[in-house]
Design a protein with these regions (language model features):
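Acidic-basic catalytic patches of nuclease active cores, encompassing PD-(D/E)XK
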Residues: 1-36, 84
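Short His-Asn-centered micro-motif
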Residues: 33, 59-60, 92-95
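Beta-rich catalytic cores
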Residues: 39
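Active-site-adjacent loop/helix micro-motif of nuclease/hydrolase catalytic cores
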Residues: 63-75
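Basic, amphipathic alpha-helical patches used to engage nucleic acids or provide basic targeting signals
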Residues: 72-85
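Nucleic-acid nuclease catalytic cores
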Residues: 82-108
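Intrinsically disordered, low-complexity terminal regions enriched in charged/polar residues
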Residues: 100-148
Length: 148
């Protein structure tokens, strides 16, 4: 049986990443609930005045080295949302004490380099799931843009 594994700490870390990224873009953000039945991704950034959605976002918090992996359904959702809305999608992450992002789709086409690999594992402190080793989208780290 697959279990929802996001903890309160995970959601707090996501919020911190959204705050940094949205401030960098001069936007506001909305974070989807872990229990959302509509979306797998973490949320989006928007213009508070016009209410226009500006981009789609998935967050990853790495205590050490960034892996830049996404499971195939999340990657598919981000790409599909970008194709339907013509808005960009990002993988936003923290590595050590810095943050960065990868532009996955620019609203027109997929712009990141990636491979599909069989990999994964159970993160420390998480409940093991039967699908922890799975096909993952491994994004080339040369695509990373580091924030300030």
């Amino acid at each position: 049986m697959i279990k929802i594994r996001e903890t309160k700490e995970d959601l707090i870390k996501q919020t911190r990443l959204f705050e940094v990224f949205s401030r960098h873009l001069n936007l506001s953000f909305n974070q989807f609930s872990s229990f959302s039945k509509k979306y797998r991704i973490d949320g989006y950034c928007y213009d508070i005045k016009s209410k226009d959605i500006v981009c789609w976002v998935e967050c990853k918090w790495y205590n050490n080295k960034a892996h830049c992996f996404l499971n195939v359904p999340k990657f598919n959702e981000l790409i599909s949302l970008s194709e339907v809305t013509s808005l960009p999608s990002y993988l936003l992450f923290r590595e050590h004490n810095r943050w960065g992002y990868v532009l996955l789709h620019d609203g027109d086409k997929v712009v990141c380099d990636y491979k599909t690999k069989l990999m994964g594992g159970t993160p420390k402190g998480r409940v093991a799931n039967s699908d922890d080793i799975e096909p993952l989208i491994a994004i080339n780290k040369s695509n990373i843009v580091w924030g300030s």
